[in-house]
Each structure stands twice: as structure tokens, then as C-alpha cells.
Design a protein with these regions (language model features):
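A cross-family signal for N-terminal binding/gating loops and helix N-caps
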Residues: 1-372
Length: 372
């Protein structure tokens, strides 16, 4: 089998990672992370080309005059703990981005002047099976009625609430930490599992755009002083980001959909950068998916509001992004395949092996990697 043929096999994306290198907590100080720098192109074994740096060195390491594009979505306290009518415990995770829920919201006049309802999608977990038509009760007056069962625990539901739904989730919900973080969410996660530039009106992600967690106000100021332009997109990170690729031939994988917003100012910034030959540096795979997804749908980056299900794996081309700042990803994950599409599978896995050997911290609260 040639390396090119191996690119399409799920088992080609395995690597060994000691459990103790999966970061369970953020670093003591935001931005106090390590940064592994790898050229996008080069030998199959990139170890001699790697640079081991600190995230604080980022302004010296980014491509000069780059346009930086980041995802400004905010993680919603989307995990609710409540009770069934039988008294049994139940957990609900809202999967539909909050702005879409609000677009669908209709007054529930039978329940009062400030009562609303809307259909949405979510995950329901409990000790037994949940019946269609069953209503579940949660804090802050949120009620969830199961309308239809779907695959992998998904449910179509009707939400009912009073007043401001975002405030209700904030009052009673929990931060939905990834499954590889083996602890309950704590008070610290409310701030540390959000980027400093996450917008209140962009709440609805069920996972953080984790490459952005390293940025501090001081780093933003330093980048601005060095002349880097900053632009933002919104991609509401869905729970599908943790969904495994199930088939051995990855070309048959169907990617989850995520809701994207590219504002006019960002589309114009990308167009200016491309016209002037300036590189575009994406903060995280979610920003990559937003930019490349819109470019695939529209032929270029333009103002857009809608869904993307783009799946980037080796052999797929990149139309927009020239550099990626990203965390380290799970074995056999679609995000590892995206990075491999950008820098080559063998190079990426060799860099990961070096990161493991040197004790880098992995996944959401872990260290970062810059590929340029």
C-alpha cells in the first residue's frame, strides 16, 4: 500500500498517547502554553524542521502581515440535569445553536405572557429509555418534551421556557466538557473554557474553539501593535465534533453539519488579503471549516449564514487558509484528518509523536501547534 492509499484508511490515523498527557485542567495562567511550530511542506519526517516555542512567541512566528481569522462563538451551558415524571434523573444536552432556537420560538399563550416554545435537537441520557411524548423537567423552568428519537441518542424535542432562554441556561446549565476530560465541570471552566473574544450574542456552541483559549488581552494587543489584522467568523461547534469516524475508508464518512456566519467585514478582509498576497491564518479547525466551507459552497469567501458539512482529508485542497493555529487532536478523528490534509498525514503524525515524546499536553486544555 502506498502512503497515498493509506491516507484513506482510518487505522492510518492512530497514535499512542499516554493518558497523563490528556490535559484535565487549563494551565494556571491563560496563554502559558507550549507551541510546536511545523512548516506546512517538507520531508516526510519533519522532526529536524520542528521548533519548540511558547505561545507568547506567536507574534514572531506567524507569517508576516497575516490576516488572523478566529471563531467568536460562545460555549452555552447546554448540559441540563433534571428529573423525569417518575423521579428518575435525566440529562439533556441542547445541540441546536441558541440563535436558531430563538428564531423558531413562538409564544406559548396557554402558559402565560412570557412563555415560549420551540423545536430543537438534543441528546437525552437517563437510566432507562425515554418515551416519545414524555416531558422532562429542568431548573429555571425549562421543560423538554421528546417528540422523535433519532440515531446515537439524538432526539427531536420541544423546549418550553419563560423569559430569556439564554439566561435560563446560564442559571441552571453546566458547561459540556468533552468526554476525555474525566471530571465534572467547575466554576473555573465557566471562564477558562471560553475564549476572551467569545461574544454574548453568539452563544450556542457545545464545545469551545479550543485553539482560541490560549489568547489573552495582552496577546491581542501585541498582535495589533505588530500590524496583524484580526477578523472573526462564527461557527457554532456541534457535539458531532466528538463523533468518531466509523468506517475504515474515511471517504465514506458523512460529516456533521455546523451552523456558520461569515459577516461582510470578514469576507471583505479575506478578499483584500488574497488580492494583496497576504496569508490567511486560521485560529483553530472551526475557523478553517467556516472559511473553507463557505468557499466550497460559494466559490469564494463571501457573506454567508447557513450550514456547512465540509470534510477535509488528504487529497482535498484548501482555497483560503495558508496557516493554522490548532491544538492537538484525538486519534482517528476528523480534525486530525483535517490537519493531515493541510500538512500531510505522515508529517503530522511524526510531529505528534515528537510532541508526545516531549511531554506536550493534548486536546482541549492542552498545548498548541502552528502549521505554516
Amino acid at each position: 500500500m502506498t502512503p497515498e492509499e493509506a491516507d484513506f484508511f482510518l487505522s492510518s490515523y492512530r497514535f499512542d498517547l499516554p493518558p497523563e498527557q490528556i490535559a484535565q485542567f487549563p494551565p494556571e495562567e491563560r496563554g502559558a502554553s507550549r507551541l510546536l511550530v511545523m512548516p506546512r511542506e517538507g520531508a516526510a519526517d519533519p522532526r529536524s524542521e520542528l521548533r519548540h516555542a511558547a505561545f507568547g512567541d506567536l507574534p514572531d512566528l506567524l507569517p508576516p502581515d497575516a490576516l488572523i481569522v478566529a471563531n467568536n462563538s460562545r460555549v452555552l451551558q447546554a448540559r441540563l440535569l433534571g428529573l423525569r415524571a417518575t423521579g428518575g434523573k435525566v440529562e439533556f444536552l441542547l445541540l441546536t445553536p441558541l440563535p436558531l432556537v430563538m428564531e423558531r420560538a413562538a409564544p406559548d399563550k396557554a402558559s402565560g405572557a412570557d412563555a415560549f416554545r420551540a423545536e430543537a435537537e438534543g441528546l437525552v441520557r437517563c437510566g432507562g429509555s425515554v418515551r416519545e411524548g414524555e416531558t422532562l423537567a429542568f431548573g429555571a423552568g425549562i421543560r423538554v418534551t421528546v417528540l422523535e428519537s433519532g440515531p446515537f441518542g439524538k432526539r427531536r424535542v420541544r423546549l418550553a421556557w419563560r423569559g430569556d432562554l439564554g439566561k435560563a441556561f446560564a442559571a441552571t446549565g453546566h458547561i459540556p466538557l468533552p468526554p476525555y476530560i474525566k471530571r465534572a465541570d467547575g466554576e473555573e471552566d465557566g471562564s477558562r473554557y471560553q475564549t476572551i473574544y467569545a461574544r454574548d450574542d453568539k452563544s450556542g456552541s457545545v464545545a469551545a474553539p479550543t485553539a482560541g483559549l490560549h489568547f489573552t488581552p495582552a496577546m491581542r494587543e501585541k498582535l495589533e501593535a505588530r500590524g496583524f489584522e484580526w477578523a472573526e467568523v462564527t461557527l457554532y461547534v456541534g457535539y458531532g465534533t466528538f463523533s468518531p469516524v466509523r468506517g475504515e475508508d474515511i471517504r465514506g464518512h458523512r460529516m456533521h453539519r455546523e451552523y456558520v456566519e461569515v459577516p461582510e467585514a470578514t469576507a471583505e478582509a479575506v478578499a483584500r488579503a488574497r488580492a494583496r498576497g497576504r496569508p490567511v491564518a486560521a485560529v483553530g479547525t472551526t475557523s478553517v471549516r467556516a472559511l473553507e466551507g463557505v468557499a466550497e459552497l460559494c466559490g469564494r469567501v463571501q457573506p454567508y449564514t447557513g450550514w456547512t458539512d465540509i470534510f477535509l482529508y488528504p487529497g482535498r485542497s484548501f482555497r483560503v487558509v495558508d496557516a493554522i493555529l490548532t491544538n492537538f487532536h484525538l486519534p482517528e478523528s476528523s480534525l486530525l484528518m483535517l490537519v493531515s490534509a493541510f500538512a500531510g498525514r505522515e508529517r503530522t503524525l511524526a510531529a505528534y509523536a515528537e510532541a508526545v515524546a516531549r511531554g506536550y499536553r493534548f486536546f482541549s486544555y492542552g498545548d498548541a501547534m502552528l502549521i505554516k
